[in-house]
């Protein structure tokens, strides 16, 4: 029994024997806790304990939320940028930009795109199974081809961007996304094929 309830629930005999002392205890308790009917004291005490428990729980939960927020803030921004290509900025060099857009158009419409999706499909089929590779292999063929083309375009725009992309720029960008690629083998395969297609743009 909580110590603050012992003075309230004392036997009547002890109450009569120590009337003065009991009266002082009662006054002290009355000033500390709200007066309530005897039958409701246990219920109110229970809810008080429950409220305290909830406060403790919420008090301990706050650092966890803060920690997750801090971790998300420390997470390398390049990972989110790879997933949202538009946040990377466009290719500024008019020549490279024209070559890039022409290449992307061929990926979607020409025989180059057909060869690309076949190569990607075979490489993904031959790799060690992952949730992503399983999802791709189970797709309907036309949906899968479009999905692979879109992912290739994303990597092309990720690799070829800025004022003028050179080989050292690609090396730097590859190092940025390397930890991400180590966790996403399918993305690594698509990035490699995208780089093969775009290498001539950088070498111009």
Curated annotation (Swiss-Prot):
Residues 25-34 have a biased composition (Low complexity). Residues 10-20 have a biased composition (Basic and acidic residues). Keywords: Host-virus interaction, Inhibition of host innate immune response by virus, Inhibition of host interferon signaling pathway by virus, Inhibition of host STAT1 by virus, Inhibition of host STAT2 by virus, Interferon antiviral system evasion, Viral immunoevasion. GO terms for biological process: symbiont-mediated suppression of host innate immune response; symbiont-mediated suppression of host JAK-STAT cascade via inhibition of STAT1 activity; symbiont-mediated suppression of host JAK-STAT cascade via inhibition of STAT2 activity; symbiont-mediated suppression of host type I interferon-mediated signaling pathway. Residues 1-77 are annotated as: Disordered. It holds the Pfam family Paramyxo_C. Belongs to the respirovirus protein C family. This is Protein C. It comes from Human parainfluenza 1 virus (strain C35) (HPIV-1). The lineage of its organism: Viruses, Riboviria, Orthornavirae, Negarnaviricota, Haploviricotina. The gene is P/V/C.
């Amino acid at each position: 029994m909580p110590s603050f309830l012992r003075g309230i629930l004392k036997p009547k005999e002890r109450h009569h024997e120590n009337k003065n002392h009991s009266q002082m205890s009662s006054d002290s308790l009355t000033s500390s806790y709200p007066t309530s009917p005897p039958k409701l004291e246990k219920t109110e005490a229970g809810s008080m304990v429950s409220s305290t428990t909830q406060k403790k729980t919420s008090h301990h939960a706050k650092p966890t939320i803060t920690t997750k927020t801090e971790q998300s803030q420390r997470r390398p921004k390049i990972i989110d940028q790879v997933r949202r290509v538009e946040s990377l900025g466009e290719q500024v060099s008019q020549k490279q930009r024209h070559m890039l857009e022409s290449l992307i158009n061929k990926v979607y419409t020409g025989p180059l795109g057909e060869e690309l999706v076949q190569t990607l499909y075979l490489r993904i089929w031959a790799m060690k199974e992952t949730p992503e590779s399983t999802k791709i292999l189970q797709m309907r063929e036309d949906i899968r081809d479009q999905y692979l083309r879109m992912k290739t375009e994303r990597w092309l725009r990720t690799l070829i961007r800025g004022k003028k992309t050179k080989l050292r720029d690609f090396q730097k960008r590859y190092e940025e996304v390397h930890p991400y690629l180590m966790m996403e083998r399918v993305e690594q395969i698509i990035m490699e094929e995208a780089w093969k297609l775009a290498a001539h743009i950088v070498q111009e």
